[in-house]
Amino acid sequence: MSLSVRFAAQCAARQLRASTRASSSLLVQKRFESTAAPAANPKIAAIVDQISTLTLLETSELVSSLKSRLNIPDLPVGGFAAAAPAAAPAAAPAEEEEAAPAAAEKTLFTLKLEKFDAAAKPKVIKEVKNLLGLSLVESKKFVESAPKVMKESVPKEDAEKIVAAMKELGATVTMD
């Protein structure tokens, strides 16, 4: 009789272990396979709710005021090459309105690779690769297609550093 009690106890223990393994694996599965987002901060959820009720015009005003308050510069979308043609037509009306501030000192510059010494070509390619974050092949094509705009909206201090570094390597870069 004690054998049957022991056997029953062992069976019960096995079933208990199996059921706890199954339930714990279900909890782990639910946690890792869940697509439900974690609970958001109530303050942020309220802001998101308010923003979602804004119209398109109100949203653009919100974005522009946030950019001005947080000092975020207007960067061209799609990189410097894609933004150059789109920026030219939009700049014409802005130039007429801002004729007086044009006399003030410029703070943002466009850097243009004009030419380079043939002997310094590998060094120039390497520097362009580092500055623009291009691959080696893209950098080589970029340098060989000079004159070409390197960067736009560069602060004066950074622009002067880049021009000096490129001049040391044997390249001519202009600041416009």
Swiss-Prot record:
It is found in: Mitochondrion. It comes from the Eukaryota. One of its GO terms (biological process) is translation. One of its GO terms (molecular function) is mRNA binding. Keywords: Mitochondrion, Ribonucleoprotein, Ribosomal protein. GO terms for cellular component: mitochondrial large ribosomal subunit; mitochondrial nucleoid. Disulfide bonds: none annotated. Component of the mitochondrial ribosome (mitoribosome), a dedicated translation machinery responsible for the synthesis of mitochondrial genome-encoded proteins, including at least some of the essential transmembrane subunits of the mitochondrial respiratory chain. The mitoribosomes are attached to the mitochondrial inner membrane and translation products are cotranslationally integrated into the membrane. HAMAP family: Ribosomal_bL12. Belongs to the bacterial ribosomal protein bL12 family. Component of the mitochondrial large ribosomal subunit (mt-LSU). Mature N.crassa 74S mitochondrial ribosomes consist of a small (37S) and a large (54S) subunit. The 37S small subunit contains a 16S ribosomal RNA (16S mt-rRNA) and 32 different proteins. The 54S large subunit contains a 23S rRNA (23S mt-rRNA) and 42 different proteins. This is Large ribosomal subunit protein bL12m. The gene is mrpl12.
